[in-house]
Amino acid sequence: MLLACSSSSNSAAPSDAGAGGDAALDGSASEGSTTLPDGAPLPREHLRIVAGNLSTGNNQNYDSGEGERIFTGLKGDVILIQEFNIGDKSPAAAQTFVETVCGPGCSYFQEPPATYNIPNGIITRFPILASGSWDDPSTTDRDFAWAQIDLPGPVDLYAVSVHLLTTGATQRATQATNLVALVNANVPAGSYVVIGGDLNTENRSEAATTTFDSIVDTEAPYPADAAKNDNTNQPRSKPHDWVMASPNLMASIVPVTIGAQSFSAGLVVDTRVYSPIADLAPALTTDSAATSMQHMAVVRDFMIPTE
């Protein structure tokens, strides 16, 4: 369901409105330029993208509050969420969660919990123009959730929230191949693309990541914590979670700055080690240690041109 506080849709088609390569080129500055024709710097908008499978407890939901607090503290502009189960799984419950982690007026798409056992979703403070689920034939309890987001400026963002299988690298490679084909078939050329979430990858060189690298950047440097640990499962031993952006969006990447700290390639958020934790309020030091906490959140920041 796509909700911007009121309306809903489960299978909206992609739209060319505001998106595509031509839209990026018919303004006052050429693609890749950092200045206007008169030499003035391009006006830019800060964009924070957060991915996280932060469900906790025995029922793969957010009801215990730990994941909700982490998302809230990170102040994401676009959140790629997995295992998006809230309360009684009603639209009202999801709306309350969205307003808590993102704020009043934020939009979201959630794969219908009545259909999907562990749905993916996208939450954003920007308008969602179209959204839906692309079929993932490898699994029945979630698909590839996507949304076309109307960012400030001439280029739209196509955000895809994914949760790949744990059954093996071969299966994940197949899922990646299918998703790349779907993006190539459905996303207008020149659009920003971000694919993020719980890939369940065992290492950074799995075939799935090589496949994704044809449309989004999967190369180092990677988001990490202050100790330079870029692993994202709860024991912090494997790189399960990713925020992967298309080259035209990566051209605008900037360090993630929270409080007095700056993380040049992005941040892996583990409340057990993040200090000072007050920077992530209302998150608590104990949140990432919650029972059955799935993984750590991943954050990347961008400064996108608005003209």
Name what the model sees in each region.
Residues P43-I49, L74-I79, C102-S107, P127-L129, ...:
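Loop/turn elements at helix/coil->beta-strand transitions in domains of secreted/extracellular proteins
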Residues N59-N61, G87-A93, I118-P119, S131-G132, ...:
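Extracytoplasmic/secreted cell-surface and envelope-processing proteins
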Residues H46-G57, A130-W134, D156-T166:
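Active-site-proximal beta-strand elements of phosphoester/diester hydrolases
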Residues N85-D156, L164:
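Structured beta-strand-rich core segments of catalytic domains in phosphoester-bond hydrolases
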Residues A185-V194, T201-E307:
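Metal-dependent phosphoester-hydrolase catalytic domains
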Residues L47-L54, I70-A92, A159, L179-T210, ...:
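Active-site beta-strand/loop signature of hydrolases that rely on acidic residues for catalysis
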Residues L2-P41:
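Ser/Thr-rich, Pro/Gly/Ala-heavy low-complexity intrinsically disordered linkers and tails
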